[in-house]
Regions:
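Conserved catalytic core of the tyrosine transesterase superfamily
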Residues: 2-18, 22-31, 38, 52-327, ...
Length: 379
């Protein structure tokens, strides 16, 4: 709980706070708490009052964060968090003042409001025809083929395959449980019931399609890990033991009197081969682990030659943009490239607004749109 730097005591409406907590996701609550703590810390250091904040304080705070490198999208979130805490405390919202709106608009004008996009993980990579073209560049198929057949490899193959099929966000992906997978009309495919997502805080639920590829990967992982219920994607602890060479037993007369006497020193020891032990956890993976898993899979695929048209410099550049969201962006672009309409894409990825799917397709649309097609023809 954050103790805000207030000008005077504020009466808290406990019922309102409880209702907001019940209606919000844990991620949203953590984000609000983090944003308000940062704002309160800045106010204390600069002799300002956190609540009720003045429009001048909010505008100056946004300016300060912009000077520290915060992106316009982040500044918009900070503004929304400050507004929310004032609403929850039933005091005047300073972010509605024209000064705050104009200051934020000026920052966006200066820095640009284009939001950095996760590098897409498309199934065949940056291809024009998702059905006929051969895979190239960074592609999901290459990553899947490069997975090892040990427990971490089996889990990662299933994890990436499901992530691409469904376009789930990291928090939604790690929340998948065995019980959420149900039969489909196609006997080789399955359906995934999504009980709650970022855009479905009321828990109405949704359904996503799991390809036969994903079904096979899930079956291999759950059989090897002995998972029958509960979280599907779990942490795998790996313990590796080095090999030890055989040791001959020592003759008694070679043992110095200054050594501690131990008859076992006279016994030979057999060679011990290297071995690896795995321990599959009971709980689900943390959402923050998904991005690092994708990057580790990319490095492995590159080392195995599965991304043969990439150089080491290409790899370093690509890794910088890969995040847990890359599979969602990649699926979005593949759907556009395959000719699906916006309504179908919004339904498949459970979008409520067309803004984000269109933003994710911005670069692809420029190349494959009308102007791009014409220029490609005329050179």
């Amino acid at each position: 709980m954050t103790k805000l730097n207030c000008r005077s005591p504020i009466t808290i409406n406990a019922e309102l706070i409880a209702a907001y907590q019940a209606a919000s996701s844990p991620h949203s609550l953590r984000a609000l708490a983090s944003d308000i703590e940062a704002f309160d810390h800045w106010c204390r250091r600069n002799g300002r009052v956190t609540s009720p904040a003045t429009p001048e304080t909010v505008a100056d705070y946004l300016d300060a964060r912009a000077g520290q490198g915060a992106k316009p999208a982040s500044l918009g979130r900070y503004k929304a968090s400050i507004a929310k805490i004032h609403q929850l405390l039933d005091i005047k919202d300073p972010t509605q003042a024209e000064l705050v709106k104009l200051r934020l608009r000026a920052i966006r004008r200066e820095k640009g409001s284009t939001q950095a996009q996760a590098r897409p993980l498309r199934f065949k990579g940056p291809v024009r025809n998702v059905e006929r073209d051969a895979p190239r560049g960074l592609n999901v198929r290459g990553l899947l083929e490069a997975c090892a057949d040990d427990l971490p490899g089996l889990r990662n193959r299933a994890l990436l395959s499901v992530a691409y099929d469904t376009g789930l966000r990291a928090s939604e992906l790690v929340a998948v449980e065995v019980e959420h997978i149900v039969d489909a009309i196609d006997p080789e495919a399955r359906l995934l019931t999504i009980s709650r997502s970022k855009g479905d805080q009321e828990g109405k639920g949704a359904t996503a399609f799991l390809s036969p590829r994903s079904v096979r990967a899930i079956a291999a992982w759950t059989a090897a890990a002995d998972i029958e219920e509960g979280p599907l994607f779990r942490r795998v602890q790996v313990r590796r033991y080095k090999a030890r060479a055989a040791v001959k037993g020592r003759r008694i007369e070679t043992i110095s009197g200054r050594e501690s006497w131990d008859l076992r020193k006279t016994l030979p020891k057999s060679a011990v081969p290297a071995r690896t032990e795995y321990d599959v956890g009971e709980g689900a993976l943390h959402p923050g682990s998904i991005g690092p898993i994708w990057r580790a899979m990319i490095r492995r695929a590159f080392d195995k030659g599965a991304l043969s048209d990439l150089t080491a410099d290409d790899l370093a550049q690509l890794l910088k943009g890969v995040s847990a969201h890359s599979t969602r962006v990649g699926l979005n672009q593949d759907l556009f490239a395959s000719g699906e309409d916006l309504a179908g894409i919004m339904d498949a990825l459970r979008w409520k607004s067309p803004r984000m799917p269109l933003a994710y397709n911005r670069n692809l649309a420029a190349e494959q749109g009308a102007a791009g097609r014409l220029i490609a023809k005329i050179g």
